[in-house]
Design a protein with these regions (language model features):
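Nuclease catalytic cores
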Residues: 1-90, 106-107, 119, 130
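Mg2+/Mn2+-dependent nuclease catalytic core
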Residues: 75-144
Length: 145
């Protein structure tokens, strides 16, 4: 089902920090029979495309400090961040989506940004929604003014 596929893609992405990690991570899923070679190749291509989007390139560089599936306690709830990255060019917050764009995703990411700014002394954070489909679609999420 699309939902199961979305959960599975998130699981795989949580194990990948750089493009170099992607191949090994995907191989392990092929070995255990979770995905076939074609799916692995398609996911590898997808990840390479995401990592090469100009506004995201720093967030996938070897020098980045990457935290995947980070849990943050904020306003009486636990927020789970898909990918939080610190680089010499600032911080990145990336949320992966496998479905259709929705306005509520922007609201959710703004809440994540508020939480991270609380923790990190108002550090500048660039936030992006990354839609993974046949096409890679990236939307920057702006803070509320």
């Amino acid at each position: 089902s699309p939902t199961e596929w979305g959960v599975f893609v998130h699981e795989i992405l949580s194990k990948i920090k750089t493009v170099d990690d992607a191949y090994d991570a995907l191989r392990s899923y092929v070995t255990e029979g979770s995905i076939d070679e074609n799916q692995a190749d398609k996911l590898l291509e997808t990840f390479k495309k995401v990592a090469s989007v100009p506004c995201l390139r720093d967030a996938y560089s070897k020098d980045a400090i990457v935290r995947n599936e980070v849990e943050v306690f904020f306003e009486d709830s636990i927020l789970r961040l898909d990918r939080y990255v610190e680089t010499s060019n600032g911080a990145f917050l990336i949320d992966y989506k496998t479905g259709k764009p929705e306005k509520s995703y922007h609201d959710k990411l703004r809440k994540y940004m508020r939480a991270l700014r609380d923790i990190n002394d108002n550090q500048d954070i660039k936030a992006y929604l990354v839609y993974l489909g046949d096409e890679i679609n990236v939307e920057e999420v702006m803070t509320e003014n």
